[in-house]
C-alpha cells in the first residue's frame, strides 16, 4: 500500500514484504536442506535467513558509521519504525482466524489489540498537533486538558483493524506516516512545550517518544495472546520475526526522513538483496 513517505522507501518496504512471504514459505523440515550462497558455496537454507539478517545489520552499521546528523525530532520517533517492524514480523504468519480467535478471560483478540495500536497512533498525531498549537511553556498541573473529538472517527478502534492482514498492515503504515507528516518539523522549543498523556502533565517530546514504546507494549500483548491461544511459532516464523526487526533497525536510519541520498540508497539496495536472497532460499526447496 502506498504511504505518504519517500517512494523509494515505499519500494523497499514492498521488497521486504515479499521477502517475508518467501521466507515464511520455507517449512521447518526444509531448513537443513542445501542452499547455494552466491559467490561462496553450499550452506543450509537456515543460514539464508541469517545471511539476510547479517546483511541488513551491515547496512545499518554503514549508515551509522557515516555520521550523518539528524534533527532531534526525527531521532526521537525513529525507534518507532523498529517497533513497527517487530510487530509486523510477529503478525506476518498469522491467519484471519488467528486475528479473531478469543483468548478468553475478557482479554482482547489480536485484531482488537492491533486496532488499539493503530487508533492510538492516529490519535497521537492529532492530539500532539493540538498541543503544539497551544505553545504552552510549562508541563505541570496548570496545563489544560485537550478537547475530545480531535481524532477522525474513521480511525476508531472499532474499525481500525478491519479487513485482511495486508489491509491491517497498510493501515498501520498510514497511521504512522500520517502522524509523522503532521509533526515532521518540530523544533527543540516545540518538543519542550507542555502536553498531557493519560491526563498526566508531560511534554510534546514525551508524547513523540511514546510512539515506539506503545507499539512495543502491545506487541508483547499480542505475543501473550498467542500463548493463551496455544499457537506456538515455528522456527521459520521465529527467524522471520528477527529478519523483520533487522529491517526495522535499518529503516530507522532513514525514517521518517533520510539524512541524505546515500543513506537511502544503501537502504534500498539492502532491501533488494534481502528480496533476492529470500527468493533464492525459497526456491532451493524446489530443486
Label the predicted regions.
Residues 124, 143-162, 179, 186, ...:
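Active-site-proximal binding-pocket segments
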